[in-house]
């Protein structure tokens, strides 16, 4: 109950400002849930009672109506206990960390591809030294074809195929974890610039 405690004179409960901050935090959490795909949403510990409200919020496209539906979703979310909301927040944070790692892995593969195209056999030798299971002939042919396609302004078929081969190699042998020493190469390249 709000108001002052008669004995101590201190306020009971959260202030209005604190209540507004908490309500806005839950509203933002609802917006994040609505932005997720159905597959991503299925991985989260969202109570079944909230699913229809989330789907309805996705369906509504009119700006004001969408905002009103999000407020309605937030109202239902405030009825949930704090542990449920904390579990949803934690799962969303873990989901974003996973996505960030995947993006970083793709960037590493792209950097390897660009190094192979720019440095040629030097970069290929480093890649093969780190990953002896890689097919030297296939990689060399893809690099040669990608350079040729670039010079002739042709569609980048070999360029894409080189990316796919490097990505498969990274998933098989741990290139995504940065075991290749690529970070050292990047810092050396940045120091040269």
From Swiss-Prot:
Keyword annotations of the record: Cytoplasm, Ribosome biogenesis, RNA-binding, rRNA-binding
GO CC field: cytosol
Membrane-crossing segments per the record: none
Bias (Basic and acidic residues): 1-10
Record's subcellular location: Cytoplasm
Pfam families: DarP
Comp. bias (Acidic residues): 181-193
GO biological process: assembly of large subunit precursor of preribosome
Gene3D superfamilies, alphabetized: PSPTO4464-like domains
Disulfide bonds listed in the record: none
GO molecular function, one term: ribosome binding
InterPro entries assigned: DarP, DarP_sf
Region feature (Disordered): 1-20, 171-193
RNA-binding as UniProt keyword: yes
Similarity section: Belongs to the DarP family.
Record function comment: Member of a network of 50S ribosomal subunit biogenesis factors which assembles along the 30S-50S interface, preventing incorrect 23S rRNA structures from forming. Promotes peptidyl transferase center (PTC) maturation.
PANTHER family documented for this protein: UPF0307 PROTEIN YJGA (PTHR38101:SF1)
Name the record gives this protein: Dual-action ribosomal maturation protein DarP
Organism of origin: Xanthomonas euvesicatoria pv. vesicatoria (strain 85-10) (Xanthomonas campestris pv. vesicatoria)
């Amino acid at each position: 109950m709000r108001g002052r405690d008669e004995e101590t004179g201190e306020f009971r409960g959260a202030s209005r400002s604190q209540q507004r901050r908490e309500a806005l935090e839950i509203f933002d959490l609802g917006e994040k849930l609505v932005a997720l795909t159905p597959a991503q949403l299925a991985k989260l510990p969202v109570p079944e009672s909230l699913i229809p409200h989330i789907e309805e919020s996705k369906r509504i496209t009119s700006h004001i109506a969408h905002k009103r539906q999000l407020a309605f979703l937030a109202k239902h979310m405030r009825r949930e206990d704090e542990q449920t909301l904390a579990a949803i927040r934690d799962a969303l944070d873990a989901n974003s960390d996973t996505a960030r790692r995947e993006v970083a892995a793709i960037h590493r593969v792209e950097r390897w591809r660009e190094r192979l195209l720019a440095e040629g056999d030097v970069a290929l030798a480093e890649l093969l030294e780190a990953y002896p299971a890689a097919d030297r002939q296939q990689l060399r042919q893809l690099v040669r074809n990608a350079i040729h396609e670039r010079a002739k302004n042709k569609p980048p078929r070999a360029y894409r195929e080189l990316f796919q081969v490097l990505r498969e190699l990274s998933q098989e042998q741990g290139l995504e974890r940065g075991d290749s020493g690529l970070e050292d190469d990047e810092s050396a390249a940045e120091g040269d610039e």
